[in-house]
Structure formats: C-alpha cells, structure tokens
C-alpha cells in the first residue's frame, strides 16, 4: 500500500531547565518544509502503520480550541503549512512544559493521503543513540529518530472532518504508557474533549446481541452459537485491522423473530455507531468467562458452563470436572513433594 505525502516538516523541542513540577522548553524551527523524497514517504508509511497498531482514544475539538482555529485557517489557505507548523509547535511547547515528563523531542507534522483519505499526523519523537562502523572500520556513536516507539502522537482525519464536522471520531490520540497525563496533555494541546468511546460502544454491542437472543427465546446452546458467530466476525475484523460494520455483522448472524439484528438495535435505541472500533478484551466475553482476584485467575469457554464447569451460587463456588492435563500434572507433582 502506498502513501502520498503532501506536506511535511520537522521541528525540535529542547529542554533548557526543569523544576519539581514544570519544564522549560524552547523551539528550534525549520524555515522551510522538508522535500518529499522516497525516504520521507517511507518514514511516513512506517509511522502510519505503527500508529494504526497503537491503542487510541477519540476526541473532538472544543469551540474555543486555538489549535482548531489555526488548522481551519490552514485548510482555508489563509496561512501556509509552514506557518501552521510554527504556531502548533509553540502551542505544544506551552502545554508540554506544564508536565514533569516533558523532554527533548523532534516534532513531526505531516499532511498525507492514504487509501483516498487525507490525514494530518502530529507526533513528538525521541532520539536514540547507537553505534555504527564507518568505512574505515572505526566505531562511532550515532543518533536516530525512534519511529517505532512513541507515545505522544495524534492524527486528524481531514476527510471525515470536512464531510461531517459533528463526527465524534475524526481525532485520535495515543493512550500512552505514561498514563492519564498523556491524554490530558494532548487534550489541552488540541483544545479537545472526549469523543467516541470504543469501550462503551463494544459494551452496548454485547448487550444488544444478548438482548437480541433473549427476545427470540433461544436456548442456551442457540444463544451461544449466535454469540460465537458474532465473535468470529469481530475477530476477523480485528485481524485485518478493520472496524465492526454493524450491517455486515447483522448479515452474518441469523434473523430472529423476522427482524434483523441491525433493525433490532436501531428500534431499541442502543446508540450504536454504524462502524465500531473493536476492543478485543471486551469482545472476549462473547465466548469466555474470565476473572481474577485473591490469587486466582480463571478463564474458560462459555459453552463449558453446566457441562464440565458448574456454578453454585449459594456457596459461591465452581466445580470443574476434567482438569487440563498440565494443571493436573502440576498438582500431582506438588502433592508428592
């Protein structure tokens, strides 16, 4: 798959001092855009692919967003991309300096097209140090941009923003390992608030599937078969990096009580989006029971309940018949010691 880079620029944020709660940063700005070469396009393709695999949250611009105002001026050709990047770098410097985790970094801003969709990608990349051997077989230190490990990044779907300004999913940002501070920081920088919540959408989808089966008075086995079909479709979408399309999902499961799943979901007002970003951990509950606590972790296929695994609610206990061989072997070895 190819990527078309339209405009790209790099700037640097340099840490000059730090106290207990804040960091002083300065900007080192380019005075012209980067030339578009095979190297820049290859870098952006890799960044795009890495970003696709990150855990992301969704946001929308607030009416008072300074960043959105600058972006709109750029899209309307009131200012050029270089000026936009300079103003964005300054906004980023101001917001990032409020957090103790702030550090040096290379800021990349790129407007590109992938699969007929226009994007604006913004990321703060770290530099890494390594060693190289030159033509004289001498060992020297070098540093390079780390384009595989990054936590501070966002992407705006410019095509979706243009077609539907009320969309709740045109803006995404990484939910970084540093925790909530990363989300707060990017929300402040972008002047954004929470948009689509994939976890909530997945939970609503699961509830809709359960209710759909219940209203048709399906047996336990029939219900589990439908849930397995739902899970298989969703797993397939995850494997190819696509979202759950509710109409496609509906076509992959039986029509119950002469009503398709999509019609049922609409009539019952579950608030499902037409396309839902899949959350793997949430979808697992379609076919598995799992839980952990007090030193115990359990996970088993839902179809085993009341066949090999029995729950006694009164005594709050599970009875398991036919233990996994490796677990049985461990228990036998332990009791013989």
UniProtKB/Swiss-Prot annotation:
Keyword list, A-Z: Cytoplasm
GO molecular function: double-stranded DNA binding; single-stranded RNA binding
Protein's cellular compartments: Cytoplasm, Nucleoid
Cellular component GO terms, alphabetical: bacterial nucleoid; cytoplasm
Chief localization: cytoplasm
Tagged with keyword Magnesium: no
InterPro entries with a match to the protein in the record: Nucleoid_associated_NdpA
Pfam families: NA37 (PF04245)
Family statement: Belongs to the YejK family.
Protein name: Nucleoid-associated protein HSM_0096
């Amino acid at each position: 798959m190819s990527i078309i880079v339209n405009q790209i620029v790099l700037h640097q944020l340099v840490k000059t001092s730090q106290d207990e709660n804040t960091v002083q940063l300065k900007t080192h700005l380019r005075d012209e855009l980067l030339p578009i070469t095979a190297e820049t396009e290859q870098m952006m393709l890799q960044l795009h692919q890495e970003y696709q695999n990150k855990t992301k949250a969704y946001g929308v611009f607030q009416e008072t967003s300074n960043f959105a105002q600058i972006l709109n001026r750029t899209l309307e050709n009131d200012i050029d991309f270089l000026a936009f990047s300079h103003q964005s770098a300054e906004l980023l410097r101001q917001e990032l300096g409020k957090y103790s985790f702030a550090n040096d970094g290379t800021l990349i801003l790129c407007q590109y097209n992938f699969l007929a969709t226009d994007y604006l990608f913004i990321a703060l990349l770290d530099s890494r140090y390594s060693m190289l051997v030159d033509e004289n077989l001498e060992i020297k230190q070098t540093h390079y941009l780390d384009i595989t490990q990054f936590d501070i990044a966002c992407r705006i779907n410019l095509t979706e923003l243009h077609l539907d300004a009320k969309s709740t999913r045109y803006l995404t940002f990484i939910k970084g390992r540093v925790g909530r501070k990363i989300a707060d920081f990017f929300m402040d920088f972008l002047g954004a608030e929470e948009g689509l919540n994939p976890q909530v959408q997945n939970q609503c989808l699961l509830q809709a599937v359960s209710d759909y089966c219940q209203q048709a008075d399906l047996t336990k086995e029939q219900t589990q078969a439908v849930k397995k079909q739902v899970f298989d479709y969703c797993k397939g979408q995850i494997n190819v990096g696509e979202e759950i399309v509710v109409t496609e999902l509906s076509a992959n499961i039986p029509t119950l009580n002469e009503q398709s799943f999509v019609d049922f979901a609409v009539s019952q007002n579950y608030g499902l989006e037409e396309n839902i970003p899949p959350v793997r951990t949430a979808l697992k509950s379609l076919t598995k029971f799992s839980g952990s606590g007090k030193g115990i972790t359990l996970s088993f296929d839902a179809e085993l309940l009341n066949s090999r695994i029995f729950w006694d609610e009164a005594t709050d206990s599970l009875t398991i018949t036919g233990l996994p061989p490796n677990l049985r072997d461990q228990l036998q070895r332990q009791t013989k010691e």
